[in-house]
Amino acid sequence: MDEPTILLTNDDGIESAGLRAVYDGLSTVGDVTAVAPAEDQSAVGRAISHEVTVHEHELGYAVEGTPSDCVVAGLEALVTDTDLVVAGCNRGANLGAYVLGRSGTVSAAVEATFFDVPAMAVSMYIPVREDAAFADIEANGDSYREAAKATTYLADHAVDAGVFEQCDYLNINAPVAEWGDAQMTVTRPSHLYEMDAEQDGDAVTLHDRIWEHMADGDIPDPEGTDRRAVVDGKVSVSPLTAPHTTEHHEALDAIAETYEPDDGGEAAD
């Protein structure tokens, strides 16, 4: 492929240090246009709007909308010759199967796959306990060095190598650069899930206990999972598919065959 046209988005907002770090890296291997939210849109999943306002920006376009809005607007109106969509770099990791539908960063990559455009989501792990104030954790442009390096390398090599003939998108998670040089390893999303909730009067507080285990380096995730790789100081790359499909389901077929729409939906004897 000649120099690719790359659409860059994120969910932290177009002014974020992570997006700028990845923009600078990708600009060495492609023609990059940022189409990113004007404000922070973290954890909005694939929320979509009917209409968005777009402002010109030195890096491309600032969109008053969600990451998925940015991808749709970008691919269909603003950067219609896009060869690759990159989302990130997110300030904070997106690890495990359970975050894939929550993350605005990952959701932007998923949105791109429905346009048959290869995509990558990239995030940076910041060690912090859940009871700490995540917003107070500093992450400047230099902290994203490993994430930007890995993203640039994959953007330069993955398409021509046929990677996206076997998957729809890549979910990349890198450690902070302060941990030193990081090897790259191919992973699968961890299935560990430790959400819980505590009620105090009218308030219910939700906790994700996994972050505490990660900060302590005490996780049960086996080798080969994304979370294990990042805690061990490696760049995790998970090749994923977007459409939710299933195998033929005989048990459900049997139930569906007994459904009679004229009897209130009760199954026949």
Swiss-Prot record:
Binds 1 divalent metal cation per subunit. Its cofactor is a divalent metal cation. InterPro entries: SurE, SurE-like_Pase/nucleotidase, SurE-like_sf. A divalent metal cation binds at D11, D12, S42, N90. It catalyses: a ribonucleoside 5'-phosphate + H2O = a ribonucleoside + phosphate. It is found in: Cytoplasm. It comes from the Archaea. GO terms for molecular function: 5'-nucleotidase activity; metal ion binding; nucleotide binding. Belongs to the SurE nucleotidase family. This is 5'-nucleotidase SurE. It comes from Haloarcula marismortui (strain ATCC 43049 / DSM 3752 / JCM 8966 / VKM B-1809).
